[in-house]
Amino acid sequence: MCIRDRGKLKELDIPFMYVGDYLEESPLGKAEWLVALSEVIGKRAEGEKVFAEIPVRYNVLKKKVADNILDAPSVMLNTPYGDSWFMPSTESYVARLIKDAGGDYIYKKNTGNASAPIDLEEAYLLASQADMWLHVGMANTLDELKAACPKFIDTRCFRGGQVYNNNARTNAAGGNDYY
């Protein structure tokens, strides 16, 4: 729903709230949205309890990685959408997740606060230099990724099988915990 539609929602007395978790630059800031969403369903105390444990666990893992990483692997993200490939900002929560997990986000040009489109040629160059490739759209297998991005099968990360998606838990409609 567009922001301009909020007047209609008010007119119809339909409650609404804006959820801006996608604007968060910190993974912990993004996680904290569970408190706001818990409030919506009348379970704020439970949301606060769950969230209180997240920073502790996150920071323990972050320190464990920092103490053990010798050489940060370069990380490529995403797949094309139409003729563009959208790359997150270096200040985004996903870039921060990569850093905190011991990786090096490969796209350094976008320092703004939103994802930026790049052309497929630049994406190919980045993927060719990357040690691993994450968030590969709807692809569940390398064969599915090959069908979606046939020009990228000769990149180092594809050839080496260093391609990972955030689809460990999905429902029948394809939804998952990440999105």
Residue ranges and their predicted role:
Residues 5-27, 105-112, 118:
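Internal alpha/beta domain cores that form substrate/cofactor-binding pockets in large enzymes
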Residues 94-114, 137, 162-167:
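His/Asp/Glu-enriched short active-site or ligand-binding loop at hydrolase and phosphoryl-transfer sites
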Residues 12-15, 37, 44, 69-75, ...:
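Loop/turn elements at helix/coil->beta-strand transitions in domains of secreted/extracellular proteins
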Residues 118-129:
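Short helices/loops that flank or line small-molecule/ion binding pockets
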Residues 46-101:
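Basic- and aromatic-lined ligand-binding clefts that recognize polyanionic substrates
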Residues 6-9, 31-38, 47-51, 55-58, ...:
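Extracytoplasmic/secreted envelope proteins and their assembly/folding machinery
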Residues 24-48, 135-179:
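Structured C-terminal subdomain patch of bacterial secreted/periplasmic proteins
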Residues 1-3:
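Conserved small/polar residues in nucleotide/adenosyl-binding loops
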